[in-house]
Amino acid sequence: YQLAGKSIRRRGRIEVDFEDKEFIPKSVFHLPETINRVIKLIRKSKRDNALIVIDAIRNPYEAKFFKDRYSAFHLMSINAPDEHRTNYLRKLHKFSEKQIEEIDSVESGKGDNSYKHLTNPNVTKCIELSDIHIFNPKNEFDNDNILKAQLAWYIALMKHPGLITPTAMERVMQVAYTVKLNSGCISRQVGAVV
């Protein structure tokens, strides 16, 4: 799937040997523009509020595309400790260590083509851009209760803002974010200690 996405972002369609062919700049937004058209069709057919989930945004430019267009767009990242994630991939999907390393490499934003920052997945950057971070421990493969509880929490907040007060961790994160914005560093790419 990642190769198909990279091909579409580079050429505007799925092609064999796409990395050897010329980069077409307008293709970078082909996927999100297509998804955006589908969203508009769904909203038009529903004639009411439509709740839409886009699964697995792995390119930061695609995330930014939706953030710029929809005020109610919330980018969520679901994180698990590396040990739990690799155990999950090994046991349930039967991936080898080499396959897991390849997945990590592909999704890290690294690559050897000249437009990799535009066309390759970059999960790390998408996590940085996330509005909501959800913790999903995978130490019990068939127990998703922690994940479900967090999703219910945030969906309730999206539908009814102010219904649930922020946790202590969320308050500290807000203070850190505010300190970052008040920084004298022009790029605002600084850490904050609270």
Predicted feature residues:
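Short hydrophobic alpha-helical segments used for membrane anchoring or interfacial signaling
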Residues: A192-V194
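Conserved phosphate-donor/acceptor-positioning beta-strand/loop module used by diverse small-molecule
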Residues: D55-I57, F66-H93
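Short, compositionally biased leader-like segments
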Residues: E140-Q174
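Small-molecule kinase domains that catalyze NTP-dependent phosphoryl transfer to phosphate-bearing small molecules
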Residues: E62, K91-A149
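ATP-dependent small-molecule kinase phosphotransfer cores
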Residues: Y1-L51, I57
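Short linear interaction motifs
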Residues: K46-P60, Y115-L118, M169-V179
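Conserved acidic residues
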Residues: A50-L51, F73, I127, D131
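Short, basic/aromatic recognition patches
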Residues: I164-V190
